[in-house]
Amino acid sequence: MDSLNEVCYEQIKGTFYKGLFGDFPLIVDKKTGCFNATKLCVLGGKRFVDWNKTLRSKKLIQYYETRCDIKTESLLYEIKGDNNDEITKQITGTYLPKEFILDIASWISVEFYDKCNNIIINYFVNEYKTMDKKTLQSKINEVEEKMQKLLNEKEEELQEKNDKIDELILFSKRMEEDRKKDREMMIKQEKMLRELGIHLEDVSSQNNELIEKVDEQVEQNAVLNFKIDNIQNKLEIAVEDRAPQPKQNLKRERFILLKRNDDYYPYYTIRAQDINARSALKRQKNLYNEVSVLLDLTCHPNSKTLYVRVKDELKQKGVVFNLCKVSISNSKINEEELIKAMETINDEKRDV
């Protein structure tokens, strides 16, 4: 196979020579047979880096990498040197194998592309004219087989796409059928309810009435509980010294005030028997990083009534209670006053 070494006519330095390719002057490295692509592009008023970015160049490099089983680094290499030196300046740049020269030259010059195009057309026309019948028929068969193979591949791709489209259409129909069945079922259920004399609006209205009745009952229970708490409070004051403490310490009532790192309700109360109070305290310490006991009272006979009295009095000072949670952020008292108030309320049971 011909090499670019055969078009070299003058040595520049070492293995680097001047050459001629059609109307293009070349710099050829006879050691590798590669040409200086950088200099060829410059002579055509172009830049090699721009050609190297094209999709065409990437496909060519990929093709020759696969065909020749070599890496890109072996396909092209760069010669560096001092461009201030006139001789060295002539040979610096990126070198490519001869397989790339036609594409780069055509990219640089439309005239060169036209010339090469005419040469190629003339070559294949002459080849056809000089071909004997047997060779020509073999060539025709080969070309037709390739075309048929391409057509078959395209038909297979098209069939796969059509199959996927059919699957999507079928899936869409099934989804629509399911939605239709759901709508029919809803209509059927609503009709059944109406036949039974039940209307959704009536059910909603009845639910609202029931909720209102429950709310009224809750209010009545709250009033009743308040009266019971007052009676129990009086009984507690009267029998405190008489009622014996449980023999087991774990069953004695405790009232505990905690402080936690909670932005909304930093204070928390525990009212329970000692054994349950310990479990509740442990749970709080598992939930929060910072938990401290501000107040721990042993209540007798009941810690629940103490909490009722605490809430009744401190709510008047702006303290907010949410079940066991307490907030004094918008109240008239501080933490020290909160603790003192709870202790005072607890001590009031002795003022008989």
Curated annotation (Swiss-Prot):
InterPro entries recorded: DUF3627, KilA/APSES_HTH, KilA_N
A Pfam family per the record: DUF3627
Protein name: Putative KilA-N domain-containing protein 006L
Keywords (A to Z) from UniProt: Coiled coil
Signal peptide (UniProt feature, chain positions): none
Coiled coil residues, start to end: 129-236
Domain KilA-N: from-to ranges: 15-123
Family: Belongs to the IIV-6 006L/238R/313L/468L family.
